[in-house]
């Protein structure tokens, strides 16, 4: 019998070879045809019906015969009764199957009995009748599955027979074993295919089911993983146990804690268990049953091993890519709805690609999984000594060949889908006369305006301008790029597109439909022209904008199935901005990219050349080089809105006011916007790949070199705000207005009447020659006045203020513990809050003290006309006491005036009051004035104050005071203070109007308007 069956096996080989050749050409369709040929040429199954057989309740003899005939099973009606026939064929009446001279005998009574005993037999053997089609009933389904099973069993018997013969020393060639192995693999594939109907039906069914299942809440991943048998064996010996999953795949399942990845793995489990059903269980049952049918013994332990390995072969990872495709399609379809209303359906096209290729992937992946499961089961049977070891190797090799054919077919199908999408794009472009991918960027920009309208509409109010010119850049879009790559149209997709939009009164102005107006903004030529605008205007680059120039793209083949779309940028050397002529304007260049690196690593820089109007302008500069012709008006240049590096401002060579050279040092810690070239990799199946180069930007260091230097030329710029780093300023011989902004800055005003601000940080400010204003701001600053009349304000922090020359000087310590050094001219001192030390000079000095100040120490060097103003204290609030050579001024604490070492000098200590200086000079303050204008002369304080004895208003001081009509000291003191302040060159008039550096309505928030005005008001009011 074995030899006759072997002859039949040999006949199958030609059929299978023909199948593999056709499959290589036509993919899944050829596979289906090949499987049909195998089935038609399979082992002959004959249904034997004894003459005394009567069908049981629930079925009929007629149904059984019809089902057999529909499946091509021969029906033999015997003249013998059931018992005689059974004993003749099977030797017993209890067997279902046996052998006859004509083929394999199926005993109808026993089969009928089996059907009625197990109503779910058809499902366990071959799937539901619905899966096979409505025309096949349960009986037909069971017969079909049994027929396929018998083919597998007999193929296994033939292979087993060959192996036994070889072990017994017979000459059995390797080709005979290979042919038998091929037959076994083909039978296994046929079994699984029959369980789901045709290959086409299966693909369609899976495509329908995949999307709904992926929408399920996938939970309980850990418990599902725990149910995979023998998963604990994963590790170094994992491959040796199963031979199916790699260590990488196993470690992915076991160790990846990322939730997203877990969801994907769970999705794979859902597909494998819910859509595929119990394929692993079915395959292992087929293999075990096949061995039993072949007369070989098995054990529960070996059966468990087979089931375990088969379960691992159908891993959730096998379906990970399938799950990704359907999920990606779903996400893209949802995403596309946003842009369809703006006339772009590219995202929906991309979704259709993932849907169609996902269905193909699902069908072919499932067939591959079945092949892997079959190979795994046979391998496990070999491990359990149920079959010889060569069987596993043969089956594995054959299934590998079939898998390769499927992969080749898949690639061709994927490319056909891509071509279909490309044709749709061509049709759209022909109809609309526009680049499809540019239309995608237009839709993205429309959505951007919709999303950011509230923000953009606020700029009119925020910047106090009538018109906003907003420039944005739609950068490279990965979906647009992917669609271009898949459709082989990478050369047609630009790196993005730039747009200009106008806002007035918070409303978007209508203009050209494509929102691109070359009259105002031309990114190809690098020109921006606002000269036609007759309103106060803000020019703002909302997003980073690429360097000016034209993109050239070329698609080339770089390998057998590899393509590259190369990018070349024909860049411009500079942007030219023509400003608003007759209205105030603001120009914000901080998002205009000036530094670029091409794909070869070569660096280039794009200069911004600005020709501004005749009014007051503000210009925010970036990290690259700029040339600014600011024109008339009070114009301010800002460097603190973005990282512009370490700056040096130099006006020492200026021939006109407002001329400066700004050098920028971009060290390793300086991150700037720079243009770079990146690559998007796109795969169309496994073998075909597209690489698309595109421009993008990033915020990172940019090392200058190769002749590239960042330098600004400023012309007619009246005020400069530095960076947030350590800057150096060198003024001109004209008026300079500098702001250090953040960082520890060094500022040198040099000649001219300068206004210098340190702002935040520990700054050093030198006024140089001229009447200068120096303001330290926050931090521990050092202010040096130099020649001329100087106005120094330390601001917050522990500051040091010095003036060495000049007829008039104002020194304000501000908050903190300060040290003030006056000149030998006329000095006005106000130490401010904190414990300060003040050094007077030989000239006429005025010291101001307020009750909220701390302990001030005054070292008066001489002079005979010094004044101390107690700005908000009366003589009733203070007392005087001599300690050594010092005169101490005490102020009341909680309404009580104390004379005690803990309280003495809680207001002021005037050092060496009672110590005579050289050549008759004294260290006294000749006049002390209170808030009401009453004053006392130093000679009376000297007479009344004995060592250790306090003197105040109530014990002798009152009679020495000068006050009341005719004796009020405040009017004259007010005049003296105003003269000192106005002599510094900053203030004049009754209310202290600023003449230098006013800045107009666009003045910097820390401009000279604020501090001198406020100081003049409170100082003169108190006087």
From Swiss-Prot:
ApxIA is partially deleted in serotypes 2, 4, 6, 7, 8, 12, and totally deleted in serotype 3. The sequence shown is that of serotype 10. The keyword Membrane applies. This is RTX-I toxin determinant A from serotypes 5/10. Hemolysin-type calcium-binding repeats lie at residues 730-747, 748-765, 766-783, 784-801, 812-829, 830-847. Keywords: Calcium, Cytolysis, Hemolysis, Host cell membrane, Host membrane, Lipoprotein, Membrane, Palmitate, Repeat, Secreted, Toxin, Transmembrane, Transmembrane helix, Virulence. One of the virulence factors of A.pleuropneumoniae, which has a strong hemolytic activity and is cytotoxic for alveolar macrophages and neutrophils. Belongs to the RTX prokaryotic toxin (TC 1.C.11) family. GO terms for molecular function: calcium ion binding; channel activity; toxin activity. It is found in: Secreted; Host cell membrane. GO terms for biological process: killing of cells of another organism. It comes from Actinobacillus pleuropneumoniae.
